[in-house]
Amino acid sequence: MNKQDFYFDLPSELIAQYPLANRSDSRLLIYNRQTEEYGHYQFREIADFLQPGDLLVMNDSKVIPARLYGHKATGGKVELLVERITGDFTFLAHIKASKSLKSNDLIYLDAGKRLEVLERQDDLFLCKASENILDLLNDLGHIPLPPYIAREDESLDKERYQTVYAKCAGSVAAPTAGLHFDDAVLSSIRARGVNIAYVTLHVGAGTFRPVRCERIQDHKMHSEWFTVSPDLCAAVKAAKSMGNRVIAVGTTALRSLESAAMGGELIPCSRDTDIFIYPGYQFKVCDGLITNFHLPESTLVMLVSAFIGHQECMALYQEAIDKRYRFFSYGDASLLL
């Protein structure tokens, strides 16, 4: 298939620039693969469409304030986006500067803090901080909003560009399907008899990388670290043995589960994955998916297309556009069953 097969015309005013006042105020478009029927609801109603014994798998990765601003000794401005923390003091980052940096160069930040460039690794730079990097980011870092949100980060983003159940620091982009869940929704889901389990996948900046190949099969996915625990594997096995559904909350949770089951059986693991899911992929674990509405020609639209069918995906997105759903990270959600 070609990249153009996944194009749709999205009015710019449907790209959400801010979150709604309340997380669960977002709209929910439900699509049933068996009946091919749509339903339009509020996200706070989602428990009504889940069944006792269903297993929701959520990504508990926490967004770090990964964007830093500094300057070189010459005064030239430097902007960093931390891609991956590799140690207490070391990390890999994308760096923007007027002139490319090299080993041993220093980057000066506010409050007397500084970074040292250790080496270049392909498109990234391995750097060392003058103190614990997570502490430094919490002091000076900015929330790294996606490129399609055309504004600077604000104080509200520290709370709202984060799921309420985020626990494991490491993502530079939010697992956005989880942004709709608040405590009341989670309580209603548990009261319904639905089980919840967690996976961790640290979302990298590569999630926004466009597909540049005409043939989608030629696209090379970015790599992200994930972990699937023995407890999660046991929960999935228990749900499947009872004939219950495993529903991924977000494409990151889905990609983690499918990566851990590449041999045909879900096994505990902690490693990198660059799994690329597009039409023709045979799903091994997931029976349902909760996800936002994604960019035209993106790998995430290709994943949705693989899950519900290509024509069905394009029709679903046209339905969302016609009904004025909000798109992308701060937008509305879909439940695909």
Swiss-Prot record:
Pathway the protein acts in: tRNA modification; tRNA-queuosine biosynthesis
Enzyme Commission number(s) from the entry: 2.4.99.17
Function: Transfers and isomerizes the ribose moiety from AdoMet to the 7-aminomethyl group of 7-deazaguanine (preQ1-tRNA) to give epoxyqueuosine (oQ-tRNA).
NCBIfam families xref list: PRK00147.1 (NF001140), queA (TIGR00113)
Catalyzed reactions per annotation: 7-aminomethyl-7-carbaguanosine(34) in tRNA + S-adenosyl-L-methionine = epoxyqueuosine(34) in tRNA + adenine + L-methionine + 2 H(+)
Species name: Legionella pneumophila (strain Paris)
UniProt keyword DNA repair, yes or no: no
Keywords carried by this UniProt record: Cytoplasm, Queuosine biosynthesis, S-adenosyl-L-methionine, Transferase
Transmembrane segments: none
GO biological process, any: queuosine biosynthetic process
Localization annotation: Cytoplasm
UniProt cross-references to InterPro entries, sorted A to Z: QueA (IPR003699), QueA_dom1 (IPR042118), QueA_dom2 (IPR042119), QueA_sf (IPR036100)
Family of this protein: Belongs to the QueA family.
Gene Ontology molecular function, alphabetical: S-adenosylmethionine:tRNA ribosyltransferase-isomerase activity
Gene3D superfamilies noted in UniProt: QueA-like (3.40.1780.10)
Entry superkingdom: Bacteria
Subunit structure: Monomer.
Name of the molecule in the record: S-adenosylmethionine:tRNA ribosyltransferase-isomerase
